[in-house]
Amino acid sequence: MGLPWYRVHTVLINDPGRLIAAHLMHTALVAGWAGSMALYELATFDPSDPVLNPMWRQGMFVLPFMARLGVTGSWSGWSITGETGIDPGFWSFEGVALAHIVLSGLLFLAACWHWVYWDLELFRDPRTGEPALDLPKMFGIHLFLAGLLCFGFGAFHLTGLFGPGMWVSDPYGLTGSVQPVAPEWGPDGFNPYNPGGVVAHHIAAGIVGIIAGLFHILVRPPQRLYKALRMGNIETVLSSSIAAVFFAAFVVAGTMWYGSATTPIELFGPTRYQWDSSYFQQEINRRVQASLASGATLEEAWSAIPEKLAFYDYIGNNPAKGGLFRTGPMNKGDGIAQAWKGHAVFRNKEGEELFVRRMPAFFESFPVILTDKNGVVKADIPFRRAESKYSFEQQGVTVSFYGGELNGQTFTDPPTVKSYARKAIFGEIFEFDTETLNSDGIFRTSPRGWFTFAHAVFALLFFFGHIWHGARTLFRDVFSGIDPELSPEQVEWGFYQKVGDVTTRRKEAV
């Protein structure tokens, strides 16, 4: 076809056979990418430490989506929850990856078939012999099938009736595992953090889709509505489909960034709002106070804090800390976490406990400031030492550790105390291996940040695509300016012969 590069899809407008082929090829590419990406991630994934080196720290993107649907084991015998020597059966990470690659190959062959055999009897009206598609009925068929799939996913896969269930965890991301989930039909089903609502809504939406699909298959639209919404134009289908996709992209960008039952922090990392609101810090303090109230010492109380919970309370795991143009996983930034040093408690020479002011999410650098329980500044690391009144040396600041590697140890020399204070502005203090990955010390975002950014951007682009194609189909007669005297084949295909089309006029050799 003699068309400019930005008009490539024009060839599909009046060609349902090759439109099917294009969609099959696109799905083949998506499935092939998913399977290939899964194999690549499996080749680079280190499952040895699910607490301090989880998949989201390693930049895994497709593995968390498999895990939340119930795939947690590998044919190599490991599980993302830390078990070894397991037998996951066929539906392991590798099994799902291979299934996608095989599906991709079959879809590729189907696309080739439909590209060659594009002029099927199926696409012609049996009464007139003219090319015709019953788009409202096709909409009903697609809606019915989508509803069936949606209902089946909710009623069987998620409930465990015929499937594994879904990833369910506690509010602090400590005890997650794949479990069958019962539907929640009450008001609590609208809580975005309640997995029962996911099940109930898939079942309900599936039933609605099945009923609506049957309605559109059996009932014809009124002629006035058919003409007003251009229901006979394939570009109407494109426009409304893009609308559905961009709406879904906006929704999932929101559920990923703000958090929900479908984006557990064990698989995708914490949200930025959990750092902003001191979510994990408050839970840690609550547990410590409860232990102290029951008679435990400070060392015992802090030693009872799970390392996993302490690791969440570290700014390097905040997805808002990574710039959009800093490529690579989180581990390429601050390094691979090795151990929790313990909770640092600072005191001045009077024995008064001091609290390090933590860095807000969008700061790249932040001063080291220590305050008392009332928020009054008591110590800092000054920029101009000559004018200093609150230096660590002047205030006699010391640091004691409770829990972790340094449990029970106290440091009094100012250089050491200051080094720990600088780390304490980032939350709990951890030891990192920066050698293995040649980590550069610049924070990266988690897959949560990448997913949100990508889907928000594509949703915006697709929104404009919806407006563009919607306008084209509503005002087609104005935009096209097609001369009504042109022959039908010239309108459909231009002046260029379509390969295999015997009806197109062409010059014969003299």
UniProtKB/Swiss-Prot annotation:
Topological domain spans for side Lumenal: 38-94, 158-196, 255-450
Keywords, sorted A to Z: Chlorophyll, Chromophore, Membrane, Photosynthesis, Photosystem II, Thylakoid, Transmembrane, Transmembrane helix
GO biological process terms, semicolon-separated: photosynthetic electron transport in photosystem II
Membrane topology: Multi-pass membrane protein
Gene Ontology CC terms: photosystem II; plasma membrane-derived thylakoid membrane
One annotated GO molecular function: chlorophyll binding
Signal peptide: none
Family: Belongs to the PsbB/PsbC family. PsbB subfamily.
Function: One of the components of the core complex of photosystem II (PSII). It binds chlorophyll and helps catalyze the primary light-induced photochemical processes of PSII. PSII is a light-driven water:plastoquinone oxidoreductase, using light energy to abstract electrons from H(2)O, generating O(2) and a proton gradient subsequently used for ATP formation.
Protein name: Photosystem II CP47 reaction center protein
Organism: Thermosynechococcus vestitus (strain NIES-2133 / IAM M-273 / BP-1)
